[in-house]
Amino acid sequence: MNQRRENYVSDPSAYPDRSADWYEYFDRKRREEIIEIIDSHPEIIDEHERNPFGYRNHPSPHLQRVHNYFRMQPTFGKYYIYTEREWSSYRIAEIREFGKLPVLTDDSFATEEEAMHAVFLKRIEDVRNELSQAEQREIAN
């Protein structure tokens, strides 16, 4: 308590919350790290295709890092497996905001494992696109 009185925050509204700025910064760094892992260890794509549920063998550390990143993302905009017909037809759906119907992709998959791997590939594609868009915004500024 050696701080002098003028060092205290007297009006919290004068100090904007910078957590969103920092989240964007650190999330971009994580996206770059994820793409670096995928590019330097392309075998994790095959590993995921062979075992998309992860129950046969524990995933490699590189695949686990990619999974952890995908799982920490906000719910809105995430993909999930929509069962069109049990045991025979699966599609990918995207979660929208509350009260909005999910968007289904046109692709259909014969097994849940095929659909799960397609979601994995779609998430990787999204991360690449987000990084590309961020780079274009930086160039434009």
UniProtKB/Swiss-Prot annotation:
The keyword Metal-binding does not apply. The keyword Hydrolase applies. Keywords: Hydrolase, Plasmid. It comes from the Bacteria. Its EC number is 3.5.1.56. It is an enzyme of class 3 (hydrolase). It catalyses: N,N-dimethylformamide + H2O = dimethylamine + formate. One of its GO terms (molecular function) is N,N-dimethylformamidase activity. Induction: By N,N-dimethylformamide. Heterotetramer of two DmfA1 (alpha) and two DmfA2 (beta) subunits. Hydrolyzes N,N-dimethylformamide, and to a lesser extent N,N-dimethylacetamide and N,N-diethylacetamide. Has no activity against the substituted amides N-methylformamide, N-ethylformamide, N-ethylformamide and N-methylacetamide or the unsubstituted amides formamide, nicotinamide, acetoamide, benzamide, acetamide and acrylamide. This is N,N-dimethylformamidase alpha subunit. The gene is dmfA1.
